[in-house]
């Protein structure tokens, strides 16, 4: 297979389809989503068989249990896919909305209209559910998309692509609006991220090594995040009960997510009141604590053990595991400084009853999501009321934070006049 030609053909078809999608009605887009949901329900056995072949190859290659779990298309995952499609169909369609319409002294009206980005390339790893999640959001937001999933899920992704195409066709929309790269050749990724004539944005969903590679090589703009080094700062004016609940949930609700707390900062004035209880809670849940000298002193006196001395590297590490870095800070100045120095600009939270300090934290912490008296685990499109998300961005341009339908659109200026000319 000539990869360059194959990918160029995908791009050309996607660009053509994107023009039809930009003018597609809400009713047609919703009909396509419902048709895909029905097709998945009807072809569940076919999808399971395709997934079984993917799983067999993955096991033969020696992939670990965690990888196999991500790759598995369970009955629950199939149900979630169907529910997700219908949830996206129920979301308000942002395309065509005109906002900020203002009369100008010249007689014209100037506003902004929300429009699709165009063609979105999505690169992801072993989760077949991403194929449906991404296709649904791109479809509803009026975009065409090229999906490049992990080679280990190729059989399942190809089967899903057929069902998506069927749904688009039934709704009178071009099947080329959602295309799956049907080759495991890694050169396809290299080509996709350089096709500036056909692809408007790349959304990578995967591990740090994948994102880092794409950041170096992509010529197409990206919506992405590299790390999720999230902090909770317990202020010396915190409610202790709230602090315990927030810090417990932020770390132990799920260990392997990008919005999980990786560093706990505690104000010196409250450390003796909150750290012993937190230390015992974490040790009961077998969380390894990597502590600075001040935190070690408080925790040792409380009988919390074992403890590991933190290094400079710990403040910069996304563990994605039951490991937590703990540091005692002098106060809010120290906490904000630490977060802006070592954090990844993803999600950070303060626990405090002091309104002025809370507002200062919100203003000065340079992150995509900043929270007061709430767990970092809330940094999620569904929890934010976006209905769904295609990913989380910690960049500052275009989309920041959880990226839902609006994040897959842009604004263009529209001018309404009555024959006016500029004087």
From Swiss-Prot:
GO biological process, one term: L-proline biosynthetic process
Main location: cytoplasm
Swiss-Prot/TrEMBL keywords: Amino-acid biosynthesis, Cytoplasm, NADP, Oxidoreductase, Proline biosynthesis
Listed pathway(s): Amino-acid biosynthesis; L-proline biosynthesis; L-glutamate 5-semialdehyde from L-glutamate: step 2/2
Catalytic activity: L-glutamate 5-semialdehyde + phosphate + NADP(+) = L-glutamyl 5-phosphate + NADPH + H(+)
Domain of life the protein comes from: Bacteria
Subcellular location: Cytoplasm
HAMAP family documented for this protein: ProA
Protein's recorded name: Gamma-glutamyl phosphate reductase
Phylogenetic lineage: Bacteria, Pseudomonadati, Pseudomonadota, Betaproteobacteria, Burkholderiales
Gene: proA
């Amino acid at each position: 297979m000539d990869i360059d030609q194959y990918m160029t053909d995908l791009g050309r078809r996607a660009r053509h389809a994107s023009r039809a999608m930009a003018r597609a009605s809400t009713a047609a887009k919703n009909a396509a989503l419902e048709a895909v949901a029905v097709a998945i329900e009807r072809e569940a056995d076919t999808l399971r068989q395709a997934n079984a072949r993917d799983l067999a190859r993955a096991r033969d290659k020696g992939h670990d249990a965690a990888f196999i779990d991500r790759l598995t298309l369970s009955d629950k995952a199939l149900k979630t896919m169907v529910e997700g499609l219908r949830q996206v169909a129920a979301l308000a369609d942002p395309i065509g909305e005109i906002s900020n319409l203002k009369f100008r002294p010249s007689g014209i009206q100037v506003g902004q209209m929300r429009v699709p980005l165009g063609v979105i390339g999505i690169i992801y790893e072993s989760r077949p559910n991403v194929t449906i999640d991404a296709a649904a959001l791109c479809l509803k937001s009026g975009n065409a998309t090229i999906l490049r999933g992990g080679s280990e899920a190729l059989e399942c992704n190809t089967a899903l692509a057929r069902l998506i195409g069927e749904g688009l066709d039934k709704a009178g929309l071009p099947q080329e609006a959602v295309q799956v790269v049907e080759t495991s050749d890694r050169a396809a990724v290299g080509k996709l991220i350089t096709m500036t004539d056909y692809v408007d944005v790349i959304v990578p969903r995967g591990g740090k090594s994948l994102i880092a590679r794409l950041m170096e090589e992509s010529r197409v703009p990206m919506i992405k995040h590299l790390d999720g080094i999230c902090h909770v700062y317990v202020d010396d004016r915190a409610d202790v009960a709230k602090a315990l609940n927030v810090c417990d949930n932020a770390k132990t609700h799920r260990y392997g997510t990008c919005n999980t707390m990786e560093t706990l900062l505690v104000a010196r004035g409250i450390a003796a009141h909150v750290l012993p209880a937190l230390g015992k809670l974490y040790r009961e849940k077998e969380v390894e604590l990597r502590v600075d000298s001040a935190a070690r002193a408080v925790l040792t006196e409380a009988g919390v053990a074992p403890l590991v001395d933190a290094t400079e590297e710990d403040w910069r590490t996304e563990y994605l595991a039951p490991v937590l870095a703990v540091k005692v800070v002098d106060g809010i100045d120290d906490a904000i400084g630490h977060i802006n120095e070592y954090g990844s600009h993803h999600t950070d939270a303060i626990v405090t009853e002091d309104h002025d300090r809370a507002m200062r934290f919100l203003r000065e912490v340079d992150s995509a999501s900043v929270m007061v008296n709430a767990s970092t685990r809330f940094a999620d499109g569904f929890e934010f009321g976006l209905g769904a998300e295609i990913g989380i961005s910690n960049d500052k341009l275009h989309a920041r934070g959880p990226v839902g339908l609006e994040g897959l659109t842009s604004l263009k200026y529209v001018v309404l006049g009555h024959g006016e000319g500029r004087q």
